[in-house]
Swiss-Prot record:
Gene3D superfamilies: 3.40.1350.10. Belongs to the UPF0102 family. GO terms for molecular function: nucleic acid binding. InterPro entries: Restrct_endonuc-II-like, tRNA_endonuc-like_dom_sf, UPF0102_YraN-like. PANTHER family: UPF0102 PROTEIN YRAN. This is UPF0102 protein PST_1070. Pfam families: UPF0102.
Length: 120
């Protein structure tokens, strides 16, 4: 595993812990499909939450939050649609897209959780 992949996995673990501590329940982690991957799929009450976790060591080319551009949002929306098709149990539940942006050194204080980060 590369250093970048290791940092990404650590960021996902930090995000998962933070969201779980905030009352969300994990449904899936790293769910893959032809449109890409959903980092975390969680349940907040009865709302299915698709969480994109972004980690940036530095902001020279933009921060973690800015890296979730329109193209990335479209891929996440398509992946979420495929998830809901594959898991019909959740298809009638309300959904939202959250982003957890983490900047180095990757401590809880460096975590920014944006609920409803974008609309589908």
């Amino acid at each position: 595993m590369s250093e970048s992949q290791s940092s990404g996995r650590s960021a996902e673990a930090l995000a998962l812990q933070h969201l779980s501590d905030s009352g969300l329940r994990l449904l899936e982690r790293n769910w893959s499909c032809r449109s890409g991957e959903l980092d975390l799929v969680m349940l907040d009450g009865d709302t299915v939450v698709f969480v994109e976790v972004r980690y940036r060591r530095h902001t020279a080319w933009g921060g973690a939050l800015e890296s979730v551009d329109v193209r990335k949002q479209q891929k996440l929306i398509k992946a979420a649609q495929l998830f809901l098709q594959a898991h019909g149990r959740w298809a009638k539940h309300p959904c939202r897209f959250d982003v957890v942006a983490i900047t180095a050194p990757g401590q809880a204080k460096d975590l920014n959780w944006i609920r409803n980060a974008f609309e589908s």
